[in-house]
Design a protein with these regions (language model features):
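Intrinsically disordered, low-complexity segments enriched in small/polar residues
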Residues: 3-266
């Protein structure tokens, strides 16, 4: 079996694929921001308020539902007034190269890139994944070409969540990721060619809110964001070495009950 490591470091989710390549490291941070009211008015962009704290499910499994323990993953607390955006970073940092990944993201059982029901496989047409580091952040669900809705906390079982609206069921709250590294030989060939690839200058860490001109607001709690097309070609992704992680979103009372109020990583 392939050794794939998923760790929490400084409240970032870190996926490492050492058997694929020593530089095959993908980091996902969950950035706090304010929720934009969904009332058909335009609002200025909310600020970035730092990272959400996170904790491993297995560290608190005695206080969690059995189904969560089976699925594993991590916990994240979110207030009703908050929203989150995802920040992606790859490689070993400065001078370490920026290893490309295909990342599938589901909120509930809905694919955040396509807005369709979730499937476990990587799909080429229509592209149902983002490519990082080319796509340095994601602010929400795709709801149309260039338009997204914020990732916000909603109580399950009241018909509010994207999952319930599309599938009519409320089984899987939270956010699910499947991360696929580029195949080793494709990465090595790309490095040798030293193509002027946009991936190699886009992988800084965007800890601040993204630049205004790339995001603009549309009415009704919508924001503008393009999903970048896969410029590498579908066959470069190593589908034999994917890694999956489930992020359970709790409200503050649930978080305190599960973790004893302990804020990890501080």
């Amino acid at each position: 079996g392939v050794i794939i490591m998923i760790e929490l470091k400084d409240d970032e989710l870190v996926f490492e694929f050492p058997k694929v390549h020593k530089e095959a490291v993908c980091r996902i941070a969950f950035q706090r921001t304010l929720r934009i009211p969904d009332d058909n008015r335009e609002y200025p962009l909310p600020p970035g308020l730092g990272r959400f704290p996170m904790a491993h499910v297995e560290d608190h499994s005695a206080r969690l539902p059995a189904s969560w323990a089976e699925r594993g993953g991590v916990l994240l607390p979110m207030y009703q007034a908050e929203a989150l955006w995802l920040n992606f970073d790859c490689g070993r940092g400065f001078g370490g190269g920026n290893y490309p990944f295909a990342v599938k993201i589901a909120a509930g059982k809905i694919n955040a890139v396509t807005g369709d029901a979730w499937s476990n496989d990587l799909v080429k047409e229509p592209q149902d994944y983002i490519v990082v580091p080319d796509q340095p952040w994601l602010d929400g669900f795709s709801v149309g070409k260039g338009l997204i809705r914020q990732f916000v906390a909603m109580p399950l079982g009241r018909g509010y969540t994207a999952e319930e609206q599309i599938t009519g069921a409320a089984e899987h709250g939270g956010i699910q990721f499947i991360v696929y590294p580029m195949k080793r030989e494709c990465y090595e060939a790309m490095r040798e060619d030293s193509l002027p690839d946009i991936a190699f200058n886009l992988c800084q860490s965007y800890e601040q809110s993204p630049a205004l001109d790339s995001m603009g607001l549309a009415p009704g709690g919508l924001m503008r964001q393009e999903i970048y097309e896969d410029e590498y070609g579908f066959d470069v992704w190593d589908t034999d070495n994917s890694s999956r992680c489930f992020v359970h979103v709790l409200n503050s009372a649930q978080w305190t009950a599960a973790t004893g109020g302990h804020t990890p990583g501080r």
